[in-house]
Amino acid sequence: FTTRGNASKMLEEALAYARAHDLPPVYILIDEYDNFTNQLLTSYNDPLYEKVTTADSFLRTFFKVIKKGIGEGSIRTCFCTGVLPVTMDDLTSGYNIAEILTLESDFINMLGFTHAEADAYLRYVLDKYTGSQERYDEIWQLIVNNYDGYRFSPKGEKLFNATILTYFLKKFAVNKGEVPEEMIDENLRTDIGWLRRLTLSLENSKAMLDALVIDNGLYYNVADLSSKFNKQKFFDKNFYPVSLFYLGMTTLFNDYRMMLPNLTMRSIYMDYYNVLNRIDGGAMRYAPVYERFTQERDFESLVQNYFEQYLGQFPACLLYTSDAA
């Protein structure tokens, strides 16, 4: 390359070389190109976000080169994955040849592993690393509870999260067939700051978490599941369910309600809930009783400890409402 450090110029040079040497058209695959813009949005760096996504920013310029290459025939197609609709909205005015496939029924199952795929995956791992299918039912139920449950259209089939299922099976294989102690991929946990940024206030954050972890869902308008929307809408209080959906945090339960898809996401959101509501989860509250339970199997003391030490920190009105529901 004669111009280094400028992605747009480098791509132009590569395409010019392909044309000059009569090479086949180029296929471009771009994954999570908006990862850095998501970080800018959730870190309150709106001015820099505007700078990199609008006018003649490097991001828009890069996609203009792709558009030109497709028009000239040096690029056969460009396929982008892992892109938030808010970034698509800021880019597609200049890259107006894009067709958004996210919610198309023929492509939905690309977003995770189907049950048939996960079944084959698990059986392969069991055969290779344990030598038998004896524990299939046990492990299958474990992965369904923790990694399944993602639905990307109201009537679509449930899918496994491919990333966290692979995390588990990799650990399972390394442990020679032993279930890993840590069931949650730490990459899923993000700083509580992003939640406050999305909801814009502590009270809004608490209300949203109450709906998700206590009432078991957020109501949404199915018409809002558009393939792109602007930044202002992304942070609108009435739009939280859809914003969370596109961030991969919630899933569609039906045409009216979104919910947390599995125990993994529920555990993560419960941690958020505890932090925002200052609920103490320290070991001294629970560990002594847990230790005694492993020796004496005193289930009554275990339950009593849970009610006194954990639920005892919740406001009485919240417990009453939850029990009544």
Task: Name these PLM-found stretches.
Residues 1-316:
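Phosphate-binding site recognition
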Residues 320-325:
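Conserved small/polar residues in nucleotide/adenosyl-binding loops
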